[in-house]
């Protein structure tokens, strides 16, 4: 099976993503921040939208659903938590469910913390994960609805994926994430290398996504909250990893 992925900008700093099954011509949008850029990308490629895979209920991830549903009558897949206001949903999914996009298989991983309903979509064959606002390149999402231990557990689920998986996240926050990370992990050679790469990409107005999970494991301080050297930098030697993660997130919130 072969898949093609297209990345483009939506709203102020959201990413839009289309994943296309070459064999069946099925195409899914990962979230739908706004309809316009998604429609343009579909037109540019000559693809028809068959599915929208929603990761969580925030407006900047579902704002385009109604218009796209009206135009294509596509299937809308969303987290099983029905307490969140996501309209036009055809299929509710939970942890370990598998969603078919043509012949492509997306495995659902519940990754709560940013929101309680947040899920990520893992395409194992394509070695790709769409993590939306749980894991960013060199960062992670704010914890709005969950707890720090909950978010840390979600990050561990994503960290457990193989190093050669590609990470596609919800926002272009990498430059600001790098700036913060260097304040708490300044001697990390992998982070320094990523910082140089990000600076070059942004200077050329290119996206910093996708990144490789192996690189994130080495350079993303939020994935290293259980590393004693990170705890030591925060003067938290011996502290629980979730507590270290919480301190990192609090510092990032204030940065």
UniProtKB/Swiss-Prot annotation:
Pathway: Secondary metabolite metabolism; methylglyoxal degradation; (R)-lactate from methylglyoxal: step 2/2. Transmembrane segments: none annotated. It comes from the Bacteria. Keywords: Hydrolase, Metal-binding, Zinc. Its EC number is 3.1.2.6. Its cofactor is Zn(2+). It holds the Pfam family Lactamase_B. One of its GO terms (biological process) is methylglyoxal catabolic process to D-lactate via S-lactoyl-glutathione. One of its GO terms (molecular function) is metal ion binding. It catalyses: an S-(2-hydroxyacyl)glutathione + H2O = a 2-hydroxy carboxylate + glutathione + H(+). It is an enzyme of class 3 (hydrolase). Binds 2 Zn(2+) ions per subunit. InterPro entries: Clx_II_MBL, Glyoxalase_II_hydrolase, HAGH_C, Hydroxyacylglutathione_Hdrlase, Metallo-B-lactamas, RibonucZ/Hydroxyglut_hydro. Signal peptide: none annotated. Zn(2+) 2 binds at residues 60-61, 133, 171. Zn(2+) 1 binds at residues 56, 58, 114, 133. Thiolesterase that catalyzes the hydrolysis of S-D-lactoyl-glutathione to form glutathione and D-lactic acid. NCBIfam families: GSH_gloB. Belongs to the metallo-beta-lactamase superfamily. Glyoxalase II family. Monomer. This is Hydroxyacylglutathione hydrolase.
